[in-house]
C-alpha cells in the first residue's frame, strides 16, 4: 500500500486512558469522520489479544472512511487482524522481520530521531517515518526533544519518504513545524484528551490543511459531520444512492 505525504497530514494515535469512560469505537469513528488522514492503534497496556480484538473492530471503520490504519509495534497482531500495516519504534521489531511477517504490500512506518536512524530508514525502504519527539510528551517520558535544526536536517535526508512529526504536538504549537519539511503531525492527547474529539479533529484538520498547503473542499452537514469530498463525501454519496435505490455507475 502506497503512503503519500498527504496521508501524513493528520495522523491520529489512539490512547484509551484519555477517554474517561467514553465508548472507544464511537470516538474512533468521530475522529475518522472529522478529518484524520491516518490512524494508529497504540495501546501500550493492552494484551496481544486485546489489540487484535480492537484492530478487527476498527478495520471496517477505517475502510469506510478510506483512512490507512496501522498497529503500533505488534507485527503479529497486524498480521492476524489484517490491517494496513505496522509502526515500529527503534526498540520494537526490526524492519526486515516486520516485512517478512507482513509481506510486501503492507505499510511499515519507522521512528527516526538520529542521522543513523534516518539513513537506515531510507536504506530499508520504510513507507513513512515518524520523526521526533518534537516536544516533551507524556506518552514517551524518555524521549528527548528534537531541535528544529535537527528536524530540518533529518527531513532533508528522507528523499521521497513521507514524514510525520511526532511528540507533544497540539493545535497551539504545530505552527512551529512550518517550513521544516514534515508532511504532517501525529497527535494523541490533542484529540483523545479533548472532551469533543470530533471538534478537536476538525480544528486540527483545517489548521494542518493551511499549514502544510493541502487544499481540500471542507463541508459540514447539519449534524456537524465533516464531509471531506475524498473519501467521506464519496462514502456518503454511495450510502444515499443505496438508500434511495439509485444505480451507481
Where are these regions (language model features)?
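A short, flexible beta-alpha/helix-coil linker loop
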Residues: 16, 135-137
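Conserved N-terminal beta1-alpha1 strand-loop-helix module at the mouth
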Residues: 1-95, 100-128, 143-146, 153, ...
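Active-site neighborhood of HAD-like aspartate-dependent phosphohydrolases
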Residues: 214-249
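Short, glycine/charged-rich beta-strand-loop motifs at protein surfaces that mediate ligand recognition
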Residues: 138-142, 164
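Conserved phosphate-binding and hydrolysis motifs of nucleotide-dependent enzymes
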Residues: 167-168, 181, 221-224
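As written
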Residues: 125, 180-183
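Flexible glycine-rich beta->alpha loop in the catalytic core of nucleotide-sugar glycosyltransferases
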Residues: 134-135, 183, 190-191, 231
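Glycine-rich beta-strand-to-loop/alpha-helix junction loops that act as flexible
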Residues: 131, 164-169, 185-189
Amino acid at each position: 500500500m502506497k503512503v503519500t505525504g498527504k496521508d501524513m497530514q493528520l495522523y491520529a494515535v489512539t490512547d484509551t486512558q484519555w477517554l474517561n469512560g467514553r465508548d472507544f469505537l464511537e470516538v474512533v469513528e468521530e475522529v475518522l469522520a472529522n478529518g484524520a488522514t491516518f490512524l494508529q492503534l497504540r495501546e501500550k497496556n493492552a494484551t496481544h489479544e486485546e489489540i487484535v480484538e480492537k484492530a478487527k473492530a476498527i478495520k471496517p471503520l477505517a475502510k469506510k472512511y478510506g483512512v490507512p490504519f496501522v498497529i503500533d509495534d505488534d507485527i503479529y497482531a497486524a498480521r492476524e487482524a489484517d490491517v494496513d500495516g505496522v509502526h515500529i519504534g527503534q526498540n520494537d521489531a526490526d524492519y526486515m522481520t516486520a516485512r517478512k511477517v507482513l509481506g510486501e504490500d503492507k505499510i511499515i512506518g519507522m521512528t527516526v530521531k538520529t542521522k543513523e536512524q534516518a539513513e537506515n530508514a531510507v536504506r530499508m525502504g520504510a513507507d513513512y517515518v515518524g520523526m521526533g519527539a518534537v516536544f516533551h510528551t507524556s506518552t514517551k517520558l524518555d524521549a528527548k526533544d528534537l531541535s528544529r535544526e535537527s528536524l530540518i536536517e533529518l527531513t532533508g535526508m528522507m528523499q521521497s519518504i513521507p514524514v510525520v512529526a511526532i511528540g507533544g504536538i497540539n493545535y497551539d504549537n504545530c505552527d512551529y513545524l512550518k517550513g521544516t519539511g514534515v508532511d504532517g503531525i501525529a497527535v494523541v492527547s490533542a484529540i483523545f484528551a479533548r472532551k469533543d474529539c470530533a471538534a478537536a479533529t476538525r480544528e486540527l484538520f483545517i489548521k494542518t490543511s493551511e499549514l502544510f498547503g493541502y487544499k481540500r473542499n471542507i463541508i459540514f452537514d447539519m449534524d456537524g459531520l465533516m464531509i471531506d469530498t475524498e473519501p467521506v463525501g464519496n462514502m456518503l454519496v454511495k450510502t444515499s444512492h443505496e438508500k434511495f435505490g439509485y444505480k451507481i455507475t
